[in-house]
Each structure stands twice: as structure tokens, then as C-alpha cells.
Amino acid sequence: MDDELREIARLEAVGELSAAHARAIALAQAHPHDVRAQLAAAYACDRNDREHDAIRFYDAAWKLGVPTAEQPGFLLGYGSTLRNVGRTDESISILTDAVRRFPDRAEFSAFLALALHSAGRSTSAVATLLKSALQAARPDGFGPYRLALAEYQKLLADEAAH
């Protein structure tokens, strides 16, 4: 299986996404109880704009138990894909949990902001995106306006909470 996973990664790296997708699906079907095979299929479906297909592989991986080292990428991919297929409440739940579990990873807040926007929660989305931008910015990012932006972010977050 390791050789097959390496071959899928190689195909993706050289842009042969359809071939990688076909191999990943075959691998997941041949190894339904292997979380690595399910993850490979989920990610390959996502890369081929087959988000609805990806969901069943994400679900299978979740049930099998995603290894700790794989959880950040899994949670981001799963949460984003749920949003893309219109399951925004589930997306928000997963991404909110990811923000709590990985507070130093600004990408989770950015994807959570997209999910909040998709759910029509614009104030929360802007507050979350602003938080992500402030978190990811270099120390001198936003210059003398950093404190003002941080205050606006707090005000928006408070407004969204009420």
C-alpha cells in the first residue's frame, strides 16, 4: 500500500490528477478499513472537483479514526468540502473545533470565515477573517493600524455573539 500511496502522490505532483484520482479510488475500495486509503481517495476527489464523492471517503476516514498527525489537513479538507456541498452547519462545527484545537493555525479561521459567509453570517465571517489576517500577518503587518483592526475585530466578534 505504501508504494501505491507514493505513486498517487507522484501523479498528483506532476499534475496527472485524473490518474491519481482513479488509483486513489481503487485503493480505497480495495482497503475499506485503512484510513490512509480513505484519506487518499477523499483528497483526490477534492482535487478533481468531485466534492460530493469526497464526502463518503472523509466520512469513512473519520469513522476509522484519523491519526493525530493527519488531523489538521483532514479537518481543513473535510470542513471545506462540507461547505462546498452546502452542508454549512457541519462545516462550521468542524472548523470551529479545528480553530479551538489548533489556535496557531490561521488557515482554520480563514476557512471558517468562508463557511460563516456561506451560512449568511456576515458579521461573524468578517470578524473571523479579520482575526485570521491579524494572526497570519508579520509583526509589523498593518503598520500603525494593527491595534485599530484588532479592536474592530473584537467589536465585530462581540456583535456576532449577540
Question: What are the functions of these language-model segments?
Answer:
Residues L39-R101:
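Alpha-helical adaptor scaffolds
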Residues S18-H21, I25-A28, I55, W62, ...:
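Tetratricopeptide repeat
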Residues P32, V66-A69, P103, A137:
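Short coil turns that delineate tetratricopeptide repeat
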Residues W62-K63, H117-D140, A150, K154:
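TPR/TPR-like (Sel1-like) alpha-helical repeat modules
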Residues L17-S18, E51, T88, S122:
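TPR-repeat structural position
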